[in-house]
Design a protein with these regions (language model features):
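Predominantly extracellular/luminal regions of secreted and cell-surface proteins
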Residues: 72-99
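Long, low-complexity serine/threonine/glycine- and acidic-rich segments characteristic of extracellular
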Residues: 1-52, 154, 158-161, 165-168, ...
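Primarily secretory-pathway and cell-envelope proteins
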Residues: 87, 196-198, 202, 210, ...
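Proteolytic processing hotspots in large secreted/extracellular or virion-associated proteins
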Residues: 56-58, 64-73, 99-144, 192
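Short edge beta-strand/loop segments characteristic of extracellular beta-sandwich folds
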Residues: 88, 130-134, 203-211
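Short, solvent-exposed loop/edge segments of extracellular or virion-exposed proteins
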Residues: 189-195
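Proline-centered linker/hinge motifs at extracellular inter-domain junctions
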Residues: 182-187
Length: 273
């Protein structure tokens, strides 16, 4: 079955958008076979039979079970005193009965938690999300809109303040709230420490972590000169491959790490090569 706004090109042989209609009440066998690029195959088999009940083409759910009908091929807007949502046309894959709910704030959040539809409904294009909140001006630079997953983790989505409203763009549904990050990133040396002899090493490694808004940038220097460092996001490891022209003797290593709201940490060490 192909959703109306699904633009993938691998449905070249699709008939009637994948909808199968039976004009009888006989029992039919159905096999669904899926192959990957390496010719691995999975098969699902089942039986199906039509009934005499007419297919309901229109939803008969009462309107109080959802807030607004969103159409996939139109601009969709939803506004309350607390939030504002604006989705470009073709942001969703099919028409949806949009749902919205407010729950009270929990630890580490500023203001309510806003449940925007359902996290299991995919979103194709980024849309604008704006949240109203009364937050002290001195704290605004450290706050941002975050999504909250089922495990209670918060994920950074940024945001810019205009008076008492913060606005950003997101590409998912789910629970959203405002959180603050006032904690500096964490830096730890893996194979470097002050005064270490590294003449037998081929690289310098450190771990960098930020548990809240996430790492935005980093800058490494040796003897005041910028060096190229590779960042392994999954392992949180920064690596500098020592170049052949590094002179023998004592050197100074510096690393600056900044998170997404401007908190920063510095690591300084000397080493002997």
């Amino acid at each position: 079955f192909k959703l109306p706004n699904n633009k993938l090109l691998n449905y070249s042989n699709l008939i009637n958008n994948g909808i199968i209609s039976f004009k009888d009440t006989l029992l039919h066998s159905v096999d669904i076979i899926v192959n990957d690029i390496y010719k691995n195959e999975s098969k699902l088999s089942f039986k199906i039979k039509s009934t005499n009940n007419p297919f309901l083409k229109k939803c008969t759910l009462p309107e109080d079970t959802f807030n607004k009908m969103f159409h996939y091929d139109a601009i969709n807007k939803f506004t309350t005193n607390d939030i504002k949502i604006e989705m470009p046309a073709y942001s969703i894959y099919e028409d949806i009965m949009f749902k919205y709910q407010i729950t009270n704030s929990v630890k580490d959040t500023y203001g309510n938690i806003y449940s925007i539809h359902n996290e299991n409904t995919p979103v194709h294009l980024k849309y604008t999300l704006e949240i109203k909140a009364d937050i002290a001006d001195s704290l605004k630079s450290k706050t941002y809109i975050a999504s909250k997953d089922l495990s209670g983790n918060y994920w950074y989505h940024g945001g810019k303040w205009e008076k008492n409203r913060i606005k950003t763009k997101v590409r998912e549904f789910g629970d959203f709230c405002i959180v603050a990050d006032t904690i500096n990133p964490e830096i730890k040396g893996v194979n470097i420490f002050p005064g270490k002899k590294i003449n037998k090493q081929t690289s310098i490694k450190l771990t960098i972590k930020d548990k809240h808004s996430g790492i935005k940038s980093f800058r490494g220097e040796i003897d005041g000169k910028w060096i190229l460092m590779d960042y392994d996001y999954k392992e949180s490891v920064l690596r500098y491959d020592i170049e052949n022209d590094l002179k023998k003797g004592k050197h100074t290593f510096k690393l600056n790490v900044t998170d997404n709201v401007g908190n920063e940490s510095n690591y300084n060490s000397t080493f002997i090569y």
